[in-house]
């Protein structure tokens, strides 16, 4: 069996790092030199079997197990996703969805699997507004009316059937085993359960799994078993996606949702389809950037910001000015996100313009190197919170195939409700629509008509699974963090371009500006006192966060030395393996 990377090593799948702590996993291995011929000039083989980084060791090891059985990166992505649904239920699951960025090395083919949740057919534009046209408090985050139709189970079958080498049944076995045998309560899960305990008490099936018989949050080390979820995974393993979107499981899901105020139908589930979309591709100082396309806004915003920054020499300015310029690029990229983006199957978007260097030059011309521009001075929309409520993983296999997967339930544990006999926690992704133009969602993001609710529509997301390649090497990067994802991936990309290691990229301090509210959020210790003073002097409003952000998972590959590193964010509990 391949050896496990020591806890001091860096991991490949999207884990998050705690400030002041070392990355939880760092692995270094050598690979053969790069070759030409595909968009990524990857060598035909990677050292050993590959690399994986994810938010929890059991999920990373599930992917490793599948690679060891002859699977490729796409099979491993199924195994890791399914295992995360079991062991990290606060952040993703069968009741959620997400995006999978893929690179197939044999022919250089790149694609993004859109497994984002979609609105039920009975959804309406004003479903969360009262008679006066004002948002009903918590209507889009609490209760079954907030749940969109899940996409993750469909992604499992799609990945295995179209891109994998192993039967779906094989790739799901690690997750099924963990769900039946159980896993130990760990600190981050314990903390999120304390946060959602009252919500879980309202759902008997949720409380049965995650709370003690007397309704309390379990102690560390308590064994959590999920037999109903194991049965649902077995149904998918045996029947494919129809084991979830049809038959008994589908009926149980619909009955449970409708009994608690939701509007799902069997037709909603039966009609769900994964959509392949062309990834966005950009250039930053000679690096090839590949990232998610709408309905994810992450790739657009990251490329928009990088294009703006490409006209500055960030190495030639002091650290405070550098951070000011990055903040101003964030401000403008998030403005464009709010104004223009939505589901490409429903709205027309100026994507070519938004990632065009000429457009970025116009944006850049409004930036002063010595002064912040208030967001209300940018043409925009009227208007007036951060987390780990998503998860990310990265995979590199021995053939050179790549996967960056970001998946979610939206907020912690979604709506906190498990329909009886399913084991499936449901999402509250309907909150990611623009409930009313200018009204912020749970992450403080505002939106416009392009992201308004419509039947069968997919809401905008900030997820940004990304590949970065230079002449010297490659990085796979992604992270959870709601609206902060874009800022974190941007900062990680800049770090990689500066030559930082995978360990340093996941561990670096983070700061963020999202256009509205007009505030620079930063992690404790991320900005030096001199930088804080300089930024305040430029007119920025600064706010120190009360907790750390994200759970970044990074894999890097140095073409010159052949070294592969997998780094898992020390802010989380994950693990990176190179073997």
What are these language model-derived features?
Residues 9-20:
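Bacterial N-terminal signal peptides
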Residues 86-93, 97-112, 263-265, 402-471:
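Active-site rim segments in enzyme catalytic domains, especially the processed small/beta chain
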Residues 312-409, 421-422, 437, 446, ...:
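Internal maturation/activation junctions in enzymes
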Residues 457, 489, 497-547:
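Extended C-terminal subregions enriched in glycine
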């Amino acid at each position: 069996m391949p050896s496990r990377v020591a806890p001091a090593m860096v991991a490949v799948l999207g884990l998050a790092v705690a400030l002041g702590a070392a990355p939880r996993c760092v692995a270094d291995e050598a690979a053969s030199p790069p070759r030409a011929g595909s968009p990524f000039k990857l060598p035909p083989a990677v050292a050993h079997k590959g690399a994986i980084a994810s938010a929890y060791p059991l999920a990373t090891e599930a992917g490793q197990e599948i690679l060891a059985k002859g699977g490729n990166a796409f099979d491993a992505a199924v195994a890791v996703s399914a295992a995360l649904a079991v062991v990290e239920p606060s952040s993703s699951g069968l009741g959620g969805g997400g995006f999978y960025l893929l690179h197939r090395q044999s022919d250089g083919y790149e694609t993004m699997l859109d497994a984002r949740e979609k609105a039920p057919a009975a959804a309406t534009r004003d479903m969360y507004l009262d008679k006066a046209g004002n948002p009903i408090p918590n209507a889009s985050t609490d209760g079954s009316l907030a749940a969109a139709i899940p996409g993750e189970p469909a992604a499992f079958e799609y990945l295995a059937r179209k891109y994998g080498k192993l039967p779906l049944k094989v790739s799901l076995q690690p997750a099924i085993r963990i769900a039946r045998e159980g896993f130990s309560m760990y600190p981050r899960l314990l903390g999120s359960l304390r946060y959602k305990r009252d919500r879980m008490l309202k759902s008997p099936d949720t409380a049965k799994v995650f709370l003690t018989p007397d309704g309390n949050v379990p102690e560390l080390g308590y064994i959590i078993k999920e037999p109903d979820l194991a049965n649902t995974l077995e149904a998918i393993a045996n029947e494919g996606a129809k084991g979830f979107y049809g038959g008994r499981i589908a009926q149980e899901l619909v009955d449970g949702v409708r009994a608690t105020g939701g509007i799902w139908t069997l037709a909603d589930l039966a009609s769900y389809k994964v959509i392949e979309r062309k990834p966005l591709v950009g250039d930053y100082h000679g690096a090839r950037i590949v990232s998610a396309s709408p309905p994810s806004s992450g790739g657009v915003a990251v490329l928009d910001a990088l294009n703006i920054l490409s006209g500055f020499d960030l190495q030639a300015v002091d650290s405070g000015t550098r951070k000011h310029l990055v903040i101003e690029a964030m401000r403008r990229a998030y403005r464009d996100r709010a104004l223009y983006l939505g589901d490409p199957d429903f709205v027309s978007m100026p994507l070519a313009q938004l990632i065009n260097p000429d457009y970025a030059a116009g944006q850049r011309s409004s930036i002063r190197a010595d002064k912040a521009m208030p967001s209300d001075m940018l043409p925009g929309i009227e208007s007036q919170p951060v987390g780990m409520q998503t998860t990310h993983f990265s995979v590199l296999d021995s053939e050179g195939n790549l996967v960056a997967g970001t998946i979610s339930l939206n907020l912690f544990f979604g709506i906190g409700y498990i329909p009886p006999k399913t084991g499936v926690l449901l999402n509250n992704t309907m909150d990611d629509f623009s409930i009313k133009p200018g009204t912020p969602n749970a992450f403080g993001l505002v939106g416009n008509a392009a992201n308004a609710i419509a039947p069968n529509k997919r809401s905008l997301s900030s997820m940004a699974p990304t590949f970065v390649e230079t002449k010297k090497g490659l990085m796979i990067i992604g992270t959870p963090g709601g609206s902060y994802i874009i800022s974190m991936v941007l900062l990680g990309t800049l770090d990689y371009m500066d030559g930082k290691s995978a360990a340093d990229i996941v561990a670096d301090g983070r700061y963020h500006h999202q256009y509205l509210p007009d505030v620079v959020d930063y992690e404790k210790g991320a900005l030096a006192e001199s930088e804080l003073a300089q930024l305040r002097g430029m007119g920025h409003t600064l706010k120190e966060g009360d907790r750390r952000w994200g759970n970044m998972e990074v894999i890097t590959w140095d073409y010159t030395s052949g070294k592969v590193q997998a780094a898992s964010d020390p802010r989380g509990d994950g693990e990176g393996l190179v073997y």
